[in-house]
């Protein structure tokens, strides 16, 4: 049984299954390729919100993963209305959260930040639809894990993605924006969020021995930055950068709390 801190509180049991992991049609909601979903569900189940906004809700897996009755509303650009959602709207979240949605105890955005054209404006919109002290949870690919840094020598940084075949219209799989821990820490902080935490994802870390070697250099640099940090907040950021999840993990799951002092 694992313990982790979520917005300053210790939660228990985040390595346990929060549901059967099976959708109503028999397919797996949270298989090994979607381990980030288990982590996101764990964070929410520890917080026990009464209302949640699921941004880019896809197949509606979240409503089946929550351990207690929760009102879940959803937004998606491509998917149709999933079962179990109280309110759903097809919308382009590049334009922000539609005004028809209210304010929530929590919001999530899984595997969608890399598609955004205006991430700062998006976070401002999310903030407007969260109650004070509400939690925002997001997941996205980790662009800077040890193995990726080798690939950067070939494809550059940000990477020259091979699936870019046209630039005339949006497609379901056309991520372009490379956001890592440090960029998210900055963006979330600038938009009124605090208590920014990286959460463990159940994945093999590292996957290759070469990554472990590179990781030694990454961790040595992070330890040096912790010692020279100009503030406690910056030192905490580098401590999270030192974690195996950030150094070796393919996924990032990050939570942040909306400060009660943040302007709507």
List PLM regions with ranges.
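A short SAM/SAH-binding and catalytic strip from SAM-dependent methyltransferases
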Residues: 106-118
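S-adenosyl-L-methionine-dependent methyltransferase catalytic module, highlighting the catalytic core
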Residues: 117-128, 135-259
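Conserved N-terminal segment of class I S-adenosyl-L-methionine
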Residues: 1-102, 106, 120-123, 200-225, ...
């Amino acid at each position: 049984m694992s313990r982790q801190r979520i917005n300053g509180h210790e939660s228990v049991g985040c390595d346990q299954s929060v549901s059967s992991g099976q959708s109503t049609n028999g397919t797996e909601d949270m298989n090994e390729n979607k381990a980030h979903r288990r982590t996101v569900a764990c964070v929410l189940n520890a917080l026990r919100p009464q209302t949640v906004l699921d941004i880019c809700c896809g197949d509606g897996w979240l409503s089946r993963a929550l351990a207690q009755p929760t009102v879940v509303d959803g937004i998606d650009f491509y998917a149709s209305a999933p079962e179990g959602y109280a309110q759903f709207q097809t919308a382009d979240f590049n334009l922000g959260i539609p005004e028809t949605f209210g304010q929530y105890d929590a919001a999530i955005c899984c595997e969608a930040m890399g598609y955004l054209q205006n991430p700062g404006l998006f976070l401002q919109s999310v903030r407007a639809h969260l109650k004070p002290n509400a939690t925002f949870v997001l997941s996205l690919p980790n662009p800077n894990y040890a193995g990726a840094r080798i690939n950067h020598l070939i494809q550059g940084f940000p990477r020259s993605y091979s699936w870019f075949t046209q630039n005339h219209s949006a497609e379901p799989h056309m991520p372009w924006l490379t956001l890592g821990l440090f960029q998210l820490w900055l963006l979330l902080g600038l938009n009124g969020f605090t208590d920014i935490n990286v959460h463990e994802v159940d994945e093999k870390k590292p996957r290759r021995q070469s990554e472990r070697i590179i990781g030694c250099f990454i961790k040595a640099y992070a330890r040096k930055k912790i010692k020279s940090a100009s503030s406690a907040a910056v030192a905490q950021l580098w401590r999270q950068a030192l974690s195996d999840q950030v150094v070796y993990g393919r996924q990032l799951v990050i939570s942040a709390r909306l400060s009660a002092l943040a302007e709507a």
